[in-house]
Amino acid sequence: SAASDVYKRQELGRVFPGYFTKSYWLPIFGCTAPDSTEKQIDFALKKLENYSADKRIFMYINFSAIHYPNCHYVKGKTKDDKESHAAALRYIDSQLPRLFEVFQKRADTLVIALSDHGTCYGEDGYEYHCISHETVYTVPYKHFILTKQ
């Protein structure tokens, strides 16, 4: 897609995937697809089937649902705002148990959840994330162990 072509021309898009053995991108994973997280997790679960449970793996998933546009997660919304942002997060959260359940069947798993940036929704008159603002560079972080069941 045009968006992924632009991304690949940027330094991060050219270099970052090279740090991984495998890198996958499909348009159905994009931020404009309302079911992108479901599709990303479906894809990840299918890939996990190729590895025995005792095989250690590193998996990085950049959930695109939180990126704009996210207004489609609230019926009738036409502009992103804190409500649609929260709805996108709830959608992502609703999909994670499927992934976590599979990892718990494999082995103890370290999960690191974080964002690459925040998003302004009117703070100090700013919108979105292509600016230097505390809201943009203050990001959530959590890590935890999923224990094998």
Language-model-derived ranges and their functions:
Residues S1-Q149:
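Catalytic domains that recognize anionic headgroups
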